[in-house]
Amino acid sequence: MNKTITPSIETIERNWFLVDAKDKTLGRLATEIASVLRGKNKPTFTPHLDTGDFVIVVNAEKVEVTGKKTSQKLYRRHSGRPGGMKVEKFESLQERIPERIIEQAVKGMLPHNSLGRQQFKKLKVYKGSEHPHAAQNPVSLNS
């Protein structure tokens, strides 16, 4: 009888992938990234282990959304204080902090537990085309 082998933390190989967000649709891009962060593209995928890879996203300010979402999509955050709810539209958040748009989209597609938080730490998002991870030799992710 065959036994399923659970990979140990030492045997998990982590690769670095580079994604250019220029002219990509936000949701389609986020699903690709979340899949790689979880490790679902690997034959050693295990749901309860962090088997995923690192993902570097560049040109975050050039990501696109379809329809009227640029003027209608709202991003909410709360300071934790009474009356501390802040609401911001997609276009103003894209001018101010474009990294947060991709981060929130991907974070919502990861597990909502400690494993998801651990996988989310492997996502690196940058506003422009420059990133400080050249030493890791990232491979372009075909998406």
From Swiss-Prot:
Name assigned to this protein: Large ribosomal subunit protein uL13
Biological process annotations from GO: negative regulation of translation; translation
Binding partners and assembly: Part of the 50S ribosomal subunit.
GO cellular component: cytosolic large ribosomal subunit
Entry's family note: Belongs to the universal ribosomal protein uL13 family.
InterPro entries: Ribosomal_uL13 (IPR005822), Ribosomal_uL13_bac-type (IPR005823), Ribosomal_uL13_CS (IPR023563), Ribosomal_uL13_sf (IPR036899)
Entry-linked PROSITE patterns: RIBOSOMAL_L13
SUPFAM superfamilies linked: Ribosomal protein L13
Keyword Ribonucleoprotein belongs to the record: yes
Keywords: Ribonucleoprotein, Ribosomal protein
Gene for this chain: rplM
Job of this protein: This protein is one of the early assembly proteins of the 50S ribosomal subunit, although it is not seen to bind rRNA by itself. It is important during the early stages of 50S assembly.
Pfam families assigned: Ribosomal_L13 (PF00572)
Gene Ontology molecular function, alphabetical: mRNA binding; structural constituent of ribosome
Species per Swiss-Prot/TrEMBL record: Prochlorococcus marinus (strain MIT 9515)
